[in-house]
From Swiss-Prot:
Source organism of this protein record: Bordetella avium (strain 197N)
Coiled coil: none
GO molecular function annotations of the record: AMPylase activity; ATP binding; magnesium ion binding
Active site, per annotation: D256
Taxonomic lineage of the native organism: Bacteria, Pseudomonadati, Pseudomonadota, Betaproteobacteria, Burkholderiales
Keywords: ATP-binding, Magnesium, Manganese, Metal-binding, Nucleotide-binding, Nucleotidyltransferase, Transferase
Similarity remark: Belongs to the SELO family.
InterPro entries associated with the record: SelO (IPR003846)
Protein name stated in the entry: Protein nucleotidyltransferase YdiU
Protein's job: Nucleotidyltransferase involved in the post-translational modification of proteins. It can catalyze the addition of adenosine monophosphate (AMP) or uridine monophosphate (UMP) to a protein, resulting in modifications known as AMPylation and UMPylation.
Amino acid sequence: MMLSKLDALTLDNSFAALPDTFYTRLAAQPLGRPRLLHANAEAAALIGLDPAELHTQAFLEVASGQRPLPGGDTLAAVYSGHQFGVWAGQLGDGRAHLLGEVRGPGGSWELQLKGAGLTPYSRMGDGRAVLRSSVREYLASEAMHGLGIPTTRALALVVSDDPVMRETRETAAIVTRMSPSFVRFGSFEHWSSRRDGERLRILADYVIDRFYPQCREANGEHGDVLALLREVSQRTAHLMADWQSVGFCHGVMNTDNMSILGLTLDYGPFGFMDAFQLGHVCNHSDSEGRYAWNRQPSVALWNLYRLGGSLHGLVPDADALRGVLAEYETLFTQAFHARMGAKLGLSVWQSDDEALLDDLLRLMHDSRADFTLTFRALAQAVRGQTQPFLDYFIDREAAQAWWSRLAARHACDGRAAAVRAEGMDRVNPLYVLRNHLAEQAIRAAQQGDASEIDRLLGLLRRPYDLQPGAEAYAALPPDWAAGLSVSCSS
């Protein structure tokens, strides 16, 4: 594979070719005395960028907002949305600057600086991102990719001593993040709320032609738009099944944080569950628990209805739109059962397996069992070592009775225990980005030390593989981790 220097990348800038009502062209506001804290060679390969370029002064200048991407077209996009279930009106990229779109071996990727200064859409914000939240986003996007879950990616993390005020004084940072597109549900809501059918159609055509060309083959009047909604609904359903299956909580599933491509987008107050609780809320700011773990699939459907309502300006037949969205629950349930069945070591999901899963989750809830390690221990039990699994439960007799039910189910499945256990280890991760692991990386980064970021990325790229010397990263959280909380402050 031929890798390029920064000024030789192939750029497309398709979003910038839309009418200028979709964005504002502007220059980034550079960080003072920026330093490259970490760069991601794996992400660089996607756009054909030579990893050596990541450590050049030219790249630092681009990643810190000092100069535009060669051949790029820097802009901030406008969108609207519902936040915590309430219409928030116009929003937009309040601190993100889209540098351009690069075509490389891994497809087309938009490059965006998050934390690069004020835009016309900043509202009450300062246009900056703090080091704390930037480290979390940088790590989380790569952790999700390692888990096989659709996500934006992270290319680089640049830091500065520039002060930023949140609850306390912090320092500024910029994440260079990558996505095939940053178009959101809220991008459609924006034009729908203005009853601007012309621009709504332009946006729909852009998304269809760029990302869902198969929708053009749909039959019937407005078939392409209905097919678009169906594709987005299907991808969203599968994304929710992915999240639920690894105990991931997004924390702020507003419609402006929902990707039109079904990607995990905008890592803020997210969290991977430690002690399992059905109604676990990872965002300290979510006082009503709207975005609790067990509500995420239904919130996603609520958000899809907001998207469907926006498309009503293009599809007058509301029943047709509702008919598409009526498919979501079946899509999600099938995807969720497939993932959870694999985690339980089942080749095919049967109707009785619903009770088996529900009973396990209830036992885990009652014991506050660790989500990741409890599921991981199931493969050990299949290999004949049941005690590690049972030790996660307060009521071990009930856990033993449950295990006996699963073992009986396995006996009807026909696979050898070793094959079954190996398959379970491939879908039950050993390493996830727990809050305390991210916090340790943040504390080191605040001292200019990126070694913990580097260590975590190495582990999280292979989350299903046992890695020697990494026992501490696969252990229960230390007691001090109970005091950690995350919020919308970033």
